[in-house]
């Protein structure tokens, strides 16, 4: 009986992870388009809006997926750790899909993806420096931090970038699920 529930955990998590991984890919595709085609300070606000939408859609997918998992697998046996376990698997499967996408992008489709991102931020910092009231010292400080980060990122192999994304997204999901699991453990009302 326990093995069946464990299999169902993976099945439910893989299904929701497919949706979440698809969203991560769509989000990154939009970001890649912005990085390579739009060079303005306004694009930064577009990316910030995309981040907010991404968080909201991620929370929606977690909530809906957990709801299905509670209804189909857990029935009345809902606990914080079971919901947290499900959320971890959901993010792990989504992150695996996303890491494969990143690897394929960096090796086949768009090897210049990270360079485009660096060039985008270089242009934005240059534009911000010409704005009235801009603090040159602060911008130079931010730019030096970005340059160091991108220098490290650009020196990594596509495999390393993909593995770092796998680890990073899974860790992000785990911490997000630590909080969301508190609210998603309530019993199912009939």
Model-derived segments and spans:
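Hydrophobic alpha-helical transmembrane segments of multipass membrane transporters and ion channels
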Residues: 15, 19-26, 89, 93-97, ...
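C-terminal halves and exits of single transmembrane alpha-helices
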Residues: 86-108
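Transmembrane alpha-helical insertion/packing segments
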Residues: 1-72
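Short membrane-interface loop/juxtamembrane segments of multi-pass integral membrane proteins
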Residues: 77-80, 130-157
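Juxtamembrane interface at the cytosolic side of transmembrane helices
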Residues: 71, 177-190
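Functional transmembrane-helix hotspots
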Residues: 101-136
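Alpha-helical transmembrane segments with an aromatic anchor "belt"
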Residues: 70-91
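Individual transmembrane alpha-helix segments
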Residues: 147-174
């Amino acid at each position: 009986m326990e093995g069946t529930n464990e299999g169902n955990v993976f099945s439910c998590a893989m299904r929701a992870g497919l949706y979440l991984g698809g969203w991560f890919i769509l989000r990154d595709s939009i970001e890649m388009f912005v990085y390579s085609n739009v060079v303005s300070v306004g694009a930064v606000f577009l990316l910030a809006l995309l981040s907010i939408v991404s968080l909201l859609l991620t929370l929606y997918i977690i909530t809906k997926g957990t709801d299905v998992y509670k209804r189909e697998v857990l029935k009345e046996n809902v606990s914080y750790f079971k919901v947290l376990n499900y959320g971890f698997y959901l993010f792990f499967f989504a992150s695996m899909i996303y890491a494969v996408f990143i690897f394929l992008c960096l090796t086949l489709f768009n090897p210049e993806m990270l360079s485009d991102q660096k060039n985008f931020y270089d242009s934005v910092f240059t534009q911000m420096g010409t704005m009235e009231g801009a603090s040159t010292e602060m911008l130079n400080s931010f730019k030096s931090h970005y340059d160091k980060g991108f220098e490290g990122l650009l020196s990594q192999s596509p495999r390393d970038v993909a593995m770092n994304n796998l680890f990073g997204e899974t860790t992000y999901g785990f911490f997000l699920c630590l909080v969301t699991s508190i609210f998603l453990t309530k019993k199912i009302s009939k």
